[in-house]
Swiss-Prot record:
Cell membrane is among the record's keywords: no
Transmembrane segment boundaries: none
Family classification: Belongs to the BaiN/RdsA family. RdsA subfamily.
EC identifiers of the protein: 1.3.1.-
Task performed by this protein: Catalyzes the synthesis of 5,6-dihydrouridine (D) at position 2449 in 23S rRNA. Can use NADH as a source of reducing equivalents but not NADPH.
Effect of inactivating the gene: The rRNA from the deletion mutant lacks dihydrouridine at position 2449.
Keywords of this entry: FAD, Flavoprotein, NAD, Oxidoreductase, rRNA processing
Binding site for FAD: 14, 33-34, 40, 46, 51, 131, 367, 380
Top-level enzyme category: oxidoreductase
NCBIfam families with a match to the protein in the record: aminoacetone oxidase family FAD-binding enzyme
Protein name, entry field: Ribosomal RNA dihydrouridine synthase
Length: 400
C-alpha cells in the first residue's frame, strides 16, 4: 500500500490550492478526484472567466450558523494574497463591478496556475478515481479506491457541496463527516434563481430577458442592490441570486424596480411639466418599455395621462413599483445553484486549522462546510483562505 503524508479528496479550487501549498513545503501529497480533469467548476465560473476573488471580502459577506468561524482564515490569507499569486503567474485581470475580479482571458488560466503550483510541489494527481471507503487507525487513514488502496497521516475533504451535479457534485463529504460522528447541518441551494407560482409566472413570462436595476429585500431585512432578470421560469439576475441565500420557503421578498428614482417627486414634476403625457410613456423614461406595457396590460399601471392620475392611484402605483411583494414558489435547486448552504457544522472544526475536533488528522475545506459567501468571488476566496489555513497545519505536522 502506497502511503502519503496527506491525501486531499476533491481537485477543485480549495483542494488544488491546499495540495500545492503542502506539497511545496515538502509534504508528500496525493490529490484525488472523480472527474477527468481538475477544476471543472472553476472553468464554468464567471461566465468562463472565473470571478476568482473580491476586493471587498469581509466576514459579514458570509452565511454560517457560526458567523465568527470564517474570520481567522480570511484574515490570515486575504484577497490581496491571492491577487499576488495571480500577478506572479502573469494573469491579466479586471474589476467588473462591486469589487468582483475576473480574468481578462479565461478561467482556464486559474486552473493552469493551480496545476502548475501543484506540479511545483510534486503533488500526485489521481483523476477518475472513486473513493469507495475510508477507514481510520492509529497510523492515520486508509482509502480504498477503485483498483488500489492508499494510506495517509492526514486526510483533507475538499469535495464541495451539491450544486451543479452535472459537474460531479455529490454528498461524499457529508457522508465522510457523518461516518466519523460529525454533525452535518441541513443543506439547500444558494445563489439560485427563483421559480414562481403558475399564475404569476404566466403573467410575467413574456418579459423573459428583460433586466432592471433593483433593490431586493428579504423578510429578515437583508438587502441587495443589483440587477434583476425576468426569465421563462421566474426571476434571476444578481439581486435574486444574492437574496435567495437569505430567503426561506413561504416567505415574501420586496422588490423596488426604481431604486434610483424618487417616484412621487418624479411624477409630480412630470405632471406639472407635461400634464397630457401618458403615464406609460412617463414611466418608460426609467423602466424598460416591455415591462411598462406588460404591467399596464395586467392593470398595475393605469392607462391615463398624468393629469388624470389621482392621488389614490398614484400611491398604489408607487407601492407596486417600489414595494412589489413576491412570494416565490421555490428555487431552481441544485441544478443551477452556484453554491450549497449548510454542510459540515463549523462547531465541529477548528477555525484556525479546519481540523475536526473529534477526529485528529481529518480536515474539511471549502464549500463542504457551513460557510457560504455572497455572489461575486467571495466563495472562491473562502476556498483559498480555508485551504491555506489547512495547509499550514499540514506543513506544521511535518516540522513537528
Amino acid at each position: 500500500m502506497e502511503r502519503f503524508d496527506a491525501i486531499i479528496i476533491g481537485a477543485g479550487a480549495a483542494g488544488m490550492f491546499c495540495s500545492a501549498l503542502a506539497g511545496q513545503a515538502g509534504r508528500r501529497v496525493l490529490l484525488i478526484d472523480n472527474g477527468k480533469k481538475p477544476g471543472r467548476k472553476i472553468l464554468m465560473s464567471g461566465g468562463g472567466r472565473c470571478n476568482f476573488t473580491n476586493l471587498y471580502v469581509e466576514p459579514g459577506a458570509y452565511l454560517s450558523q457560526n458567523p465568527h468561524f470564517c474570520k481567522s482564515a480570511l484574515a490570515r490569507f486575504t484577497q490581496w494574497d491571492f491577487i499576488d499569486l495571480v500577478n506572479k503567474h502573469g494573469i491579466a485581470w479586471h474589476e467588473k463591478t462591486l469589487g468582483q475580479l475576473f480574468c481578462d482571458d479565461s478561467a482556464q488560466q486559474i486552473v493552469d496556475m493551480l496545476v502548475d503550483e501543484c506540479e511545483k510541489g510534486n503533488v500526485t494527481f489521481r483523476l477518475r478515481s472513486e473513493v469507495l471507503s475510508v477507514a481510520k487507525d492509529e497510523t492515520g487513514f486508509t482509502l480504498d479506491l477503485n483498483g488500489m488502496t492508499v494510506g495517509c497521516e492526514k486526510l483533507v475533504i475538499a469535495t464541495g457541496g451539491l450544486s451543479m451535479p452535472g459537474l460531479g457534485a455529490s454528498p461524499f463529504g457529508y457522508k465522510i463527516a457523518e461516518q466519523f460522528g460529525l454533525n452535518v447541518l441541513p443543506t439547500r441551494a444558494g445563489l439560485v434563481p427563483f421559480t414562481l407560482h403558475k399564475p404569476l409566472l404566466e403573467e410575467l413570462q413574456v418579459l423573459a430577458g428583460v433586466a432592471v436595476p433593483s433593490v431586493i429585500t428579504a423578510e429578515n431585512g437583508t438587502v441587495f442592490r443589483e440587477n434583476l432578470l425576468f426569465t421563462h421560469r421566474g426571476l434571476s439576475g444578481p439581486a435574486v441570486l444574492q437574496i435567495s441565500s437569505y430567503w426561506q420557503p413561504g416567505e415574501f421578498v420586496s422588490i423596488n424596480l426604481l431604486p434610483d428614482v424618487d417616484l412621487e417627486t418624479f411624477l409630480n414634476e412630470q405632471r406639472n411639466a407635461h400634464p397630457n403625457q401618458s403615464l406609460k410613456n412617463t414611466l418608460a423614461v426609467h423602466l424598460p418599455k416591455r415591462l411598462v406595457e406588460r404591467l399596464q396590460q395586467l392593470g398595475q399601471i393605469p392607462d391615463v395621462s398624468l393629469k388624470q392620475l389621482n392621488v389614490r392611484d398614484q400611491q398604489a402605483l408607487i407601492s407596486t413599483l417600489t414595494d412589489w411583494r413576491v412570494q416565490p414558489n421555490g428555487t431552481e435547486g441544485y441544478r443551477t445553484a452556484e453554491v450549497t448552504l449548510g454542510g459540515v457544522d463549523t462547531n465541529e472544526l477548528s477555525s484556525r486549522t479546519m481540523e475536526a475536533r473529534k477526529v485528529p488528522g481529518l480536515y474539511f475545506i471549502g464549500e463542504v462546510m457551513d460557510v457560504t459567501g455572497w455572489l461575486g468571488g467571495y466563495n472562491f476566496q473562502w476556498a483559498w483562505s480555508s485551504a491555506w489555513a489547512c495547509a499550514q497545519d499540514l506543513i506544521a505536522a511535518k516540522s513537528s
